[in-house]
Amino acid sequence: MRKRLSALAPLLIIAFTLTACGGGSSVAEESFIEGSGAVTNIKLEDRKAAPALSGMTLTGKTFIFNPGKVAVVNVWASWCSPCRAEIPTLIELSKQYPNVQFMGILTRDNPVNAEALARRLNIQYPTFIDDALLLGFKSTLPANAIPSTVLIDKSGNVAARISGEVTLTSL
């Protein structure tokens, strides 16, 4: 019996070590789920005002969004694989539609890591580093699904939401 246990000990140690190598490396990462990519359009009569969007951006500048044009607000984090995957699509769309204001909201992330990713991928639209901005979307966005994207109409109302990775066809 002792020989069996001593023979199994290395296997148990390896198994324990491998289970400790889970997907996320922080509590912030593990508390989020990936959205399904579902698009929800909100009827005109059911639309509610989007929260005021202003604050410090990754570049250290203050940005204030003034309603009057359509806006796309993307919630992301640098550690989120689907977020990183959708960034080139958002960049391409922001270039195709210069009259649409694209913005990002960084959530539960280290701004230094996010700023490095934004610089590497050449994200030109502003990204807010204030998680408190998300509170204004609490009735619109799932609290723990990223990436998430909100479309704001010209009147400043939430017109649609995408829970999950944005694609060229979903936006």
Residue spans for each PLM region:
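N-terminal targeting signals for export/organelle localization
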Residues: 1-52
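A short beta-strand-turn-helix
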Residues: 45-71, 138
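Short active-site neighborhood of thiol/selenol oxidoreductases, capturing the structured segment around
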Residues: 62-84, 90
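Active-site-proximal beta-strand/loop segments in catalytic clefts of secreted hydrolases
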Residues: 75-77, 105-108, 130-131, 165
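Structural microenvironment flanking redox-active thiols in thiol-disulfide oxidoreductases
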Residues: 84-122, 133-138
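Thiol/disulfide oxidoreductase modules built on the thioredoxin-like
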Residues: 119-124, 130-171
